[in-house]
Each structure stands twice: as structure tokens, then as C-alpha cells.
């Protein structure tokens, strides 16, 4: 389900849905290292998508068992990537680690909060 944080908008709007979904799975039990590898691989795919002019989002809130059954997966689905050509203006907004992390829309712009680098580095 896309746009879960903005249910009143009934996203995606007709004709604006993603062109592809990639279900990222693991053949071994999920643990810390699987999650690290997941992050690296997904980031690489999203960077490549951006390089060729596409947008993408990670979907982590989904019914794993339903996806596994629907696509006859033997492996554990961990994340779904949604890839497509974006039509909306997106702006990143720097926030502190304690601010609200939910994305929002205002005046036709889709705002995506991102924690400041200074707040991510522990040292």
C-alpha cells in the first residue's frame, strides 16, 4: 500500500503508480547482518534508479505472508522497492533526530524529512 502516511489522499493517484516493484528476499534467517546487506543492496538499486531518472521508495510495512503466497516465494520477503518515473516535486527537509519523521504534502510539494548528518554521526 503506497502513501500509508497520507490515507486521505488515496495514493497513488490514477495514472501515477509505480512501473515496477522489486521484492527483496533472503534465503537465510533475518539478523543484523542480513539487514545491513539489505540496506546496502537497496541503496545501490535506488541510486542506480536515480541515475537513470527514476524515483523509488522502500516499502517495509506489508503483509509478508500474503506476498509470499501471491508470488509463490520460498524465501522470506524483507522489503519491496517501488520504482517509477515521478511526476511530483519532492523536497528533502532536514530534521533533528527527535522531530516527526513522517513525510507530508503542502502546496503541491511532497516533503521527505531526513535526519541531519550531524545527528547521525556518533562520536
Task: Tell where the protein language model's regions lie, with residue ranges.
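Acidic, surface-exposed loops and disordered segments
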Residues: 1-123
Amino acid at each position: 500500500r503506497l502513501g500509508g502516511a497520507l490515507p486521505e489522499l488515496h495514493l497513488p493517484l490514477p495514472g501515477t503508480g509505480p512501473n515496477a516493484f522489486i521484492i527483496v528476499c533472503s534465503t537465510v534467517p533475518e539478523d543484523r547482518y542480513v539487514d545491513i546487506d539489505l540496506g546496502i543492496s537497496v541503496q545501490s538499486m535506488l541510486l542506480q534508479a536515480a541515475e537513470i531518472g527514476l524515483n523509488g521508495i522502500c516499502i517495509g510495512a506489508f503483509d509478508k505472508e500474503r506476498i509470499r503466497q501471491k508470488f509463490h516465494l520460498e524465501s522470506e520477503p524483507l522489503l519491496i522497492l517501488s520504482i517509477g518515473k515521478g511526476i511530483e516535486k519532492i523536497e528533502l527537509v532536514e530534521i533533528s533526530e527527535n522531530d516527526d519523521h513522517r513525510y507530508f504534502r503542502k502546496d503541491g510539494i511532497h516533503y521527505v524529512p531526513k535526519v541531519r548528518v550531524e545527528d547521525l554521526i556518533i562520536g
